[in-house]
Amino acid sequence: MSKLEFFFDYDCPFCMRGYHALLENLAQHPDIEVIWRPCDINPLPEANPYSYNLGIQGYYFAEEKGIDLFEYNTRVFQGANVDRVDRYDHAKFAEYVKDLLDPEELTEALRSGKYKEKQFAGNDYAYEQNGVWYIPALRMNGKKLDATGGLGISEKELAKFLKKAK
C-alpha cells in the first residue's frame, strides 16, 4: 500500500479544492493510504499572539480522540472557507464541530495550547523537511506535487500524480 502525504491548511481555498479532488480520486485508488499533514499557509513566529491555528490544533485533538479525520477535515474546510467561522475564537470553533468533538473538552485543549507545538512541528515537517513550497502539496514514494501559487492543483494534475507516483 502506498502512503500519500497531503499537506494543507484549512484556511486555504486551494487546499479545500485539492482536498475534494483528492476525495473524488481516492475511490479509484484503494491501495493508497492518506496521511494528513496540516500546516500553516503563512507560518508566523511562535511568539506572535496570532500564531495559533484552531483548525490544525483541533485536528491533533480529533486524531487523539480517534475521530474520523475525513469528517473532521471536511467540516473544518467548510467552516473556514464557506461558513467563515471565526478562526481565533476557541468557543465558536468548538461549537462548530460539536457533533464531532466535545466542545468543552476541545475548548479547554485549545486554550491550554496543548497542540501548539504539534502545529509548529507540522510546519517544520512540511516546509523544512519536505521542501513544500505551495500548498496543497502531495508526497508519495519519493515523488512530489506542489500547488502553483495562486492556482492550486487541478483535478487533472492530482489524478495524474496519483497514477504515476504509486
Question: Which sequence ranges carry the predicted segments?
Answer:
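A structure-centric signal for secondary-structure junctions around beta-strands
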Residues: 1, 55, 134-135
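Short active-site neighborhood of thiol/selenol oxidoreductases, capturing the structured segment around
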Residues: 1-13
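Generic serine detector
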Residues: 2, 51-53, 112, 154
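Generic intrinsically disordered, low-complexity segments enriched for polar/acidic and small residues
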Residues: 4-5, 69, 74, 85, ...
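Structural alpha/beta surface segment adjacent to cysteine/selenocysteine redox centers
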Residues: 10, 16-96
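C-terminal cap of thioredoxin/glutaredoxin-like
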Residues: 19-30, 94-166
